[in-house]
């Protein structure tokens, strides 16, 4: 295969959105799969809305996802600069060439005149387009209009007849009639190029071979192909990937949930899980497997398995995939992810002392199997902080009225006060001793202890839970629960 050069060119007007992240990922994977180059540049010609802060946020999000690039912003390269506002001279040169060859012209129409044209087309039931009023202005006409203070835009002269055909690598053959396009603006009155013009110049000068982007850009492609042809440039191959829809099959938006990568990062999703999920929004591996490492994806990705049909953003599936990765994640990493949420909840503060660090560590270990993303750890705070017990149901409270409960809780309290270090392994051994001493097994031992400690019949890992609560916390919980349930444990003192 030819040397593949692909790019991702975000506009720095806000955070990196899910759709943009998927486009970046597909480009990255194609380049890595076939030994090509992945370029990241910035389309910052929206001067009012663009900011370096947004640029940094987007680049940081790409790096967090593990999407690296070979050339472009932050890394440099032979086609620098990689911001459009630093490349304005190249667009001016191309526009001047088109003007000189009669393939573009200056248009002096006011916004009011253009709006009247749009309304006229709408009344006839036609798509709005430019009428061509300024197509054949004489030099005297232009001088007069400039004297009136009008600042021209530059429009591309679209052929009156014919069609522009695209052989899209995802959508197949698509054709657009030139008559429906109309002469479009390539340079605004302030000298800033429009998207359709600048992107062609950039892609051509950076030798881009494949453009992989969202389906919403398909309608831009005929305009871009006309510019390629007018400048005598070879266009890249195009692949327009499907839209991302919400579960109600409308276009993904904030009402469906978080739409930016940073929002998922802040909620404690793992980047490798989000990458795994994003690639499945439109790409099929061809089998039943759904969990892929980045290396797996690089080895398998190809455009021929990218679907035409829209992809549905399924939060339940994302949570399932992230849960799979959380189960395998290093505990220290999860503790770091949990800390901002615990700090915000006000139950810990940095720097942690030894006792607090131990508590948080074992809390995270206890809930690792129970959460889909780390922000959910706050739901478990009542189980780990404070001595208060609230029974989740009458059924849970009734567990403590079972015949064997007093001897089980007494034995548990004895073991807790023996002085051995509390670790998950030691707690596991301790609970085995309780079953042996009481001659009770399974549910008859573990359920009353769990209910006494948490007020719940189901919950996080019991060994890590007791370790996180600590000796005093666990003893106080058991005593308090027994008191609330009317369970007599006797008057034996249990020192901590």
Swiss-Prot record:
A motif ('KMSKS' region) lies at residues 251-255. InterPro entries: aa-tRNA-synth_I_cd-bd, aa-tRNA-synth_I_codon-bd_sub2, aa-tRNA-synth_I_CS, aa_tRNA-synth_I_cd-bd_sf, Glu-tRNA-ligase_bac/mito, Glu/Gln-tRNA-synth, Glu/Gln-tRNA-synth_Ib_cat-dom, GluQ/Sye. It holds the Pfam family tRNA-synt_1c. A motif ('HIGH' region) lies at residues 10-20. Its main location: cytoplasm. GO terms for molecular function: ATP binding; glutamate-tRNA ligase activity; tRNA binding; zinc ion binding. It is found in: Cytoplasm. One of its GO terms (cellular component) is cytosol. It catalyses: tRNA(Glu) + L-glutamate + ATP = L-glutamyl-tRNA(Glu) + AMP + diphosphate. GO terms for biological process: glutamyl-tRNA aminoacylation. Catalyzes the attachment of glutamate to tRNA(Glu) in a two-step reaction: glutamate is first activated by ATP to form Glu-AMP and then transferred to the acceptor end of tRNA(Glu). NCBIfam families: gltX_bact. PANTHER family: GLUTAMATE--TRNA LIGASE, GLUTAMATE--TRNA LIGASE, MITOCHONDRIAL-RELATED. This is Glutamate--tRNA ligase. It comes from Heliobacterium modesticaldum (strain ATCC 51547 / Ice1).
């Amino acid at each position: 295969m030819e040397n593949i050069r692909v790019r991702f060119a975000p506009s720095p007007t806000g955070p990196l959105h899910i759709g943009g992240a998927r486009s970046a990922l597909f480009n990255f994977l194609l380049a890595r799969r076939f030994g090509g180059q992945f370029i990241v540049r910035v389309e910052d010609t929206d001067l009012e809305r663009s900011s370096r802060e947004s640029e940094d946020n987007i680049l940081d999000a790409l790096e967090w996802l593990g999407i690296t690039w070979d050339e472009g912003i932050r890394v440099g390269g032979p086609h620098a600069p990689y911001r459009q506002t630093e490349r304005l001279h190249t667009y001016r040169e191309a526009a001047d060439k088109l003007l000189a060859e009669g393939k573009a012209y200056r248009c002096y129409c006011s916004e009011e005149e253009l709006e009247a044209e749009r309304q006229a087309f709408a009344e006839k039931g036609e798509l709005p387009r430019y009428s061509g009023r300024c197509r054949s202005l004489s030099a005297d006409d232009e001088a007069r209009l400039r004297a009136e203070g009008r600042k021209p835009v530059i429009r591309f002269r679209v052929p009156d007849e014919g069609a522009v055909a695209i052989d899209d690598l995802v959508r197949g053959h698509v054709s657009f009639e030139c008559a429906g396009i109309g002469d479009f603006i390539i340079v605004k009155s302030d000298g800033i190029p429009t998207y359709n013009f600048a992107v062609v110049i950039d892609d051509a000068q950076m030798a881009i071979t494949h453009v992989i982007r969202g389906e919403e850009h398909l309608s831009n492609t005929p305009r871009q192909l006309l510019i390629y042809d007018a400048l005598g440039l070879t266009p890249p191959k195009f692949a327009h990937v499907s839209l991302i829809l919400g579960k109600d099959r409308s276009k993904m938006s904030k009402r469906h949930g978080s739409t930016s990568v940073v929002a998922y990062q802040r909620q404690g999703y793992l980047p490798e899980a989000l990458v795994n999920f994003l690639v499945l929004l439109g790409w099929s591996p061809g089998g039943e497997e759904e969990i892929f490492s980045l290396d797996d994806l690089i080895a398998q990705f190809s455009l021929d398995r990218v679907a035409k049909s829209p992809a549905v953003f399924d939060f339940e599936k994302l949570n399932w995939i992230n849960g799979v990765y959380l189960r395998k994640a290093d505990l220290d990493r999860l503790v770091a992810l949990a800390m901002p949420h615990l700090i915000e909840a006000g139950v810990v503060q940095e720097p942690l002392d030894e006792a607090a660090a131990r508590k948080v560590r074992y809390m995270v270990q206890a809930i690792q199997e129970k959460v889909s993303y780390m922000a959910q750890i706050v739901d478990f705070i009542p189980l780990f902080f404070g001595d208060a017990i609230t029974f989740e149901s009458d059924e849970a409270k009734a567990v403590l009225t079972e015949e064997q409960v007093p001897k089980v809780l007494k034995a548990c309290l004895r073991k807790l006060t023996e002085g051995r270090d509390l670790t998950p392994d030691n707690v596991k051994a301790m609970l085995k001793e309780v079953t042996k001493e009481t001659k009770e097994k399974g549910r008859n031992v573990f359920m009353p202890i769990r209910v006494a400690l948490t007020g719940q019949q189901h919950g996080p890992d019991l060994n890590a839970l007791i370790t996180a609560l600590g000796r005093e916390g666990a003893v106080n919980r058991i005593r308090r629960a027994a008191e609330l349930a009317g369970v007599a444990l006797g008057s034996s003192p249990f020192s901590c």
